[in-house]
C-alpha cells in the first residue's frame, strides 16, 4: 500500500486519505455481516452503467458510500490509490491538476474505476495502453467469503488478479485499486479523416496502430465513427502543450457532428476526455437534446450521460417508449446496446454484415491492443476475456433499438450479433443483454478458470454466478 497521503505530504483537496478510506471499508464489512446468510450479496448502489435487467432483491446491500473517492495521488511515482466506487469524473479531477491522467479513461463520467476493471472499459488510448485493468498494480477485493485480500500480479492472489477483469462482481468487489498514471499536456489536437469505404478505413487504422503515427505526425488517441457504408471517419488525437483556441462541445455545438464538419480541431485535455459524455455519444438525440430549440433551453448541467440515464430509468419503469410506438401503430422494439471486439482484419467484414442486417447508425470504432509486455504472463493473460497479446482488435459500439420482426424469437437481433461475433473470432462485453447457452458462455468467458476462482473466493456462493448475472438476469 502506498504511503502517499499517510507520510510525507499533505493531502490535496480531492484526496481523502487512507484513514477516511479505512472508515469506509469498516462500514462495508459491517454491511456484509448484516446481509442474511441465505441472501445473495449485492451492492447497495442506486446508479449503474449496465444495460441488462436484473432481478430485484429485498435483502440489504453492501454499503459502499465510503468508497467513492481518490485516496491519494503520488505525482512522482505517477500512481494513484483509488476507492473502488470512485467515478472517473472524480478521478480525472484529482489527477489533472498534477498533469496526470489514468492510462485509459472510459467515455462516460459516472463509470467507476472498480466497474471498469471488473466489467471492462475502453477509450481512444487503448491502442497503446490496453484496457483499464492492465494499468492496475494491486487491488483490494472484498471476496464472497467476506474477507478483504490484496491481489497483485505476483502474490498468492495472482490468479484472482488475472480473473477479476470481466467478473462483474461475481468474485468480489474492489475496495481499493492502485493504478498507473501518465503525463498529459493541456491540449489535444485532432484530425478527422474521411473514408468512403470501410475497408480502406480498416487498412489505415491498422497502419496507424502499428506505426503510432500518420502522415509524419504522432498519434496518441485513435477512434472512429461510421455514419454509413460510404461515410466513415477516423479521429486522430495528438497531445500538445501549444496554446491556442479550443472548441467547446458542452453548449450548442455537438461533438460527433463536428467530425463531419471539420478536418481539424483542438480541445482541452479535460474536454477531450469527456467529449462523448455531453451527448452520450449521439444517444441524446433520443430525448430531443440535439434539436436546437430544445438544446437552447436544456440546462447545461443536465447535458451529461448521468442525466440521460435517469430518463432511461423512467422509460424502463413506465414503458414510455413502447407506449408511444404502440400509439403510432409501430411494432415493439428490441434494444440493441452492445460493445463487441473483433480482430482488426475482420472489422470491415463485421461492419458490412451489420450495416446490411441491423438498421443502426452511427457506429463507434475503437482499436485496442493488450499492453506489451503484459502485466501478467500467458498466451491469454486475462482468462475471463481472453484477448490475445500482440493482436489488434477493434471495439465496435452500437446503442439503439430495432423493430421486432413478426414471429421472431426474443432477442433475435442480439442473438444474430452474438453468432456473427463468434464467427469472426471476436468477443462481446457483458454490460448488456446476452443470450448464450451455458456451454458456449463457459467457452467464451473463462470456464474452468472461473469455476476454480469461484470455489476459492466465494465457496458458499454468496455472490451471483457470472452466467446467472450476465445471461439469466438474476
Question: Model-derived features: where do they sit?
Answer:
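Noncatalytic alpha-helical scaffold of FAD-dependent oxidoreductases
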Residues: 1-474
